[in-house]
């Protein structure tokens, strides 16, 4: 971003963006300059500001002066409400131990096919945890029963009854269905799930769900740990809008300072080129002056 950026740590005012602000250079008077440096490089700020030597490109915006403007009576910036960019901050993540993902084998491929009389069939990707969630989130008014569930390393028996009244509140009756679920893990194990309700409410629909294959997948409680990152500008679950804006402003401030430095370097290069041309011309003139007397003497 072009223009001047306030050099006060934690302030991101820019002359190009903030048209209503004034930007002041550091005074030449030694005493005033010392006071400015002492206030700008205030306690708790480390890094370049500990040995900060301002140049003409460093400006202080009017937000840091009483009354919002520098005057004859107000010559020293004293308002610093923002936190320093380089202040030492304790990282919240350093005190927290990251959870290691617990991977559990789970069947993922689910084939849903219609029984005779139904043409549609569909292939879904589902985990064992997802299948359980699907069973628990069935249409309100249905009863779900899971029996005789066996695995390669454990024997599980459970009964889940999910009852609700949402369908009654909507004034509609859920269509009853029978759902058969089969699990193929290399052994002859099966999960039999039956959803049913009163047969007098309507016709029955039947679906067959076949789950095949094994694939390790992290449990749901480990997902937040997978989203964490050690990068200082990464977005964690606890990142607030103010923190994100502060980080973006820091990046914007760095870019603005780099642009100012690039302009200064370009100006210096241009000045050096002009000086080089002048020196070459002077050398050429001196050589010419030396040769002229020799020619006249001959």
From Swiss-Prot:
Assigned GO CC terms: nucleoplasm
Coiled coil: 242-283
Residue stretches spanning the membrane: none
CDD domains listed in its UniProt record: cc_THAP11_C (cd22291)
Subcellular location: Nucleus
Keyword annotations from UniProtKB, A to Z: Coiled coil, DNA-binding, Metal-binding, Nucleus, Repressor, Transcription, Transcription regulation, Zinc, Zinc-finger
One GO MF term: RNA polymerase II cis-regulatory region sequence-specific DNA binding
One GO BP: regulation of transcription by RNA polymerase II
Entry-linked PANTHER family: THAP DOMAIN PROTEIN 11 (PTHR22794), THAP DOMAIN-CONTAINING PROTEIN 11 (PTHR22794:SF2)
Job description of the protein: Transcriptional repressor that plays a central role for embryogenesis and the pluripotency of embryonic stem (ES) cells. Sequence-specific DNA-binding factor that represses gene expression in pluripotent ES cells by directly binding to key genetic loci and recruiting epigenetic modifiers.
Family: Belongs to the THAP11 family.
Protein name, as recorded: THAP domain-containing protein 11
Gene field: thap11
């Amino acid at each position: 971003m072009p223009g001047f950026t306030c050099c006060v740590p934690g302030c991101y005012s820019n002359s190009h963006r903030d048209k209503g602000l004034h930007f002041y250079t550091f005074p030449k008077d030694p005493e005033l300059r010392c006071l400015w440096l002492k206030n700008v490089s205030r306690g708790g700020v480390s890094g370049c500001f500990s040995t900060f030597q301002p140049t003409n490109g460093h400006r202080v915006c009017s937000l840091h002066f009483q009354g919002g403007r520098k005057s004859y009576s107000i010559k020293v910036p004293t308002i610093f409400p923002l936190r320093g960019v380089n202040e030492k901050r304790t990282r919240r993540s350093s005190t927290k131990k990251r959870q290691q993902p617990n991977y559990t084998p789970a069947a993922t491929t689910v084939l849903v096919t219609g029984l005779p009389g139904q043409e549609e069939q569909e292939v879904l990707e589902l985990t064992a945890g997802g299948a359980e969630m699907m069973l628990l989130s069935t249409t309100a008014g249905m009863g779900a029963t899971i029996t005789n569930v066996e695995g390669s390393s454990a024997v599980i028996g459970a009964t889940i009854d999910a009852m609700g009244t949402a369908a009654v509140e909507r004034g509609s009756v859920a269509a009853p269905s029978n759902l058969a679920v089969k699990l193929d893990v290399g052994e002859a194990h099966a999960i039999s799930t039956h959803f049913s309700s009163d047969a007098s409410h309507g016709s029955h629909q039947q679906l067959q769900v076949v789950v095949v294959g094994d694939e390790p997948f992290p449990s749901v409680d480990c997902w937040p740990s997978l989203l964490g990152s050690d990068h200082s500008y990464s977005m964690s679950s606890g990142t607030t809008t103010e923190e994100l804006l502060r980080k973006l402003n820091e990046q914007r401030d760095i870019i603005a300072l780099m642009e100012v430095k690039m302009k200064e370097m370009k100006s210096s290069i241009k000045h050096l080129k002009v000086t080089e041309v002048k020196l070459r011309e002077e050398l050429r003139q001196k050589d010419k002056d030396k040769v002229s007397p020799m020619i006249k003497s001959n």
